[in-house]
A protein has these predicted regions:
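Alpha-helical transmembrane segments and terminal signal-anchor/GPI-anchor hydrophobic tails
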Residues: 47, 52-56, 67-70, 74, ...
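Membrane-embedded alpha-helical segments of multi-pass membrane proteins
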Residues: 2-16, 36, 93-97, 131-139, ...
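TM-lumen/periplasm interface segments of multi-pass membrane proteins
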Residues: 17-19, 23-95, 328-349
Length: 349
């Protein structure tokens, strides 16, 4: 826990710096935090989800066939494995790629980059260890510049580039059409419809039988479902958290016709709709992996909200609530019994 506590407290302290008013110090901290993130992900050992599967795959990827992994991820492993047997070299290379795509996007578009990094760490902790999807997630975050610049060819080329690492990226293809504002009544109507579908259990009643056909590896699905089934309260808190930030962000959209705030709002709102429909159904764990591409934009929404509502008192309250909620999600979400893949954080040396 010491590593997580240090990271959270350090990033929280950095988030108080006014980046725009102290650009020189801000750039230094931003660069330092980049290397801190790389070392945090690259030097871990037996820490994070799916550690054993990915570690064994790396050791044997030059001669064993692993059909369950996408070709891009296989090739990436083979390239590094051909040079060294040290798995941490692979993790460091992956971390450089992932954060090398995410950090420039935050620096370019976030209203408060250091605050966004604090939110990012709290949000992505449960994704630590999901090597394949983390690469495709990083590519998707980098690709939002093409949405904002209306360069649809480059956006969909980015999607194609991410597919060899994790096919779930295909769900993000809809993002290009979400950079426009809807009338309030349409947001409300969509949410009411999704709540209705959830209350009347429409998904399981009419589509539950196809779960085995879309889940692929049933053994892994059952394992993840067991994890999900322990978190009913966490699911409710997830819906409440999403609703809270959307409610706080909506007044800031009055002058927004396009831009990152509007795009982030719509992507995050879509994650709320999907989460509401599939929460508690047999599809929950399958869909939750896909919604990571939308949920991640919470980090930008929180930054806009905290930045938009001036006042130190407001900032303290908002960040405290955010920290407590994300700490609960990040540390306890994957606990099954006494086992937790994140605790303790272990270094490779």
């Amino acid at each position: 826990m010491a590593v997580y506590i240090f990271m959270v407290l350090f990033l929280y302290s950095c988030s108080w710096l006014d980046f725009k008013a102290n650009r020189k110090i801000g750039y230094i901290l931003f660069t330092f935090i980049f290397f801190l993130f790389v070392l945090h992900d690259g030097l871990r050992w037996e820490t994070g989800t799916d550690w054993g599967n990915y570690y064994r795959f790396f050791l044997n990827c030059l001669w064993d066939e692993w059909e369950q992994f996408e070709p891009g991820y296989v090739l990436f492993n083979q390239l590094i494995r051909g040079l060294t047997i040290d798995y941490n070299v692979f993790l460091l290379c992956e971390a450089v790629i992932v954060w090398g795509l995410i950090f420039p996007t935050i620096r370019k578009y976030s209203p408060d980059p250091l605050l966004t990094l604090f939110c990012l760490y709290c949000t992505l902790l449960p994704v630590l260890g999901m090597n394949r999807q983390l690469i495709s997630l990083a590519i998707s975050i980098y690709s939002i510049r093409f949405i904002l610049n209306r360069q649809w060819i480059f956006f969909y080329l980015s999607i194609l580039l991410a597919c060899p690492f994790h096919l779930s990226i295909l769900i993000f293809a809809v993002a290009y059409f979400l950079n426009s504002k809807l009338k309030t009544k349409y947001y409300v109507l969509l949410l009411v419809v999704c709540i209705g579908l959830s209350v009347f259990d429409v998904i399981d009643k009419y589509f539950g039988e196809i779960v085995p056909y879309v889940s692929g590896d049933d053994t892994r699905l059952m394992g993840y479902t067991e994890i999900e089934s322990t978190g009913v309260n966490a699911s409710f808190l997830g819906i409440a958290r999403k609703s809270l930030w959307l409610f706080l962000a909506y007044p800031l959209l009055k002058k927004e016709r396009e831009g990152l705030l509007l795009l982030s709002f719509n992507l995050y709102f879509l994650s709320l709709l999907i989460y509401t429909i599939f929460n508690g159904t047999d599809f929950q764990i399958i869909v939750s992996r896909g919604t990571n591409y939308f949920t991640i934009y919470e980090v930008f929404i929180v930054s806009y909200v905290v930045y938009g509502y001036k006042g130190k008192g407001v900032k303290i309250i908002m960040l405290f609530v955010y920290f407590i909620g994300m700490l609960y999600k990040g540390i306890d979400y994957y606990s099954v019994g006494r086992y937790n893949p994140f605790i303790p954080y272990q270094f490779c040396f």
